């Protein structure tokens, strides 16, 4: 699954955006994906996952949109995840938490490829290629 830098959310609810990845996902699977993606803030919104998000995620910050897009990608079946500057709008602390969560949950289970200008990713990498 490819996750680009830009916002890829569609108009609807956060839940509908997540379910695009896997329509049969359970509530627990949706919540786990949000937790791993450091998007637990969703559960604090007045309507939780049923909170609306406009086209391109309007109503949410760019960093929030990125984390929801990552959560959606985590719901897709498959063994490869490609994050292309997908944490660019996150503050360093949130980025580190997300990277830690991904490592703890998927290390050895999925191949995760980070394309990034940030050095935070390096400590979670098995291999680093600099171009």
What kind of region is each of these model predictions?
Residues 1-6, 14-17, 33, 51-131:
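ABC-family ATPase nucleotide-binding domain "signature/switch" substructure
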Residues 7-52:
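Conserved "ABC signature" C-loop
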């Amino acid at each position: 699954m490819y996750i680009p830098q830009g916002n890829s959310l569609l108009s609807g609810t956060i839940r509908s955006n997540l379910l695009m990845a896997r329509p049969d996902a359970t509530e627990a699977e949706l919540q786990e994906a949000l937790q791993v993606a450091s998007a637990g803030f969703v559960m604090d919104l007045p309507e939780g996952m049923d909170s609306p998000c406009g086209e391109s995620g309007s109503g949410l910050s760019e960093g929030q949109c990125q984390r929801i897009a990552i959560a959606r990608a985590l719901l897709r079946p498959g063994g490869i995840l490609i994050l292309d500057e997908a944490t660019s709008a996150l503050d360093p602390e949130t980025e580190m938490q997300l990277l830690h969560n991904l490592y703890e949950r998927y290390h050895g289970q999925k191949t995760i490829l980070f394309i990034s200008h940030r050095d935070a990713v390096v400590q979670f990498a098995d291999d680093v290629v600099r171009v």
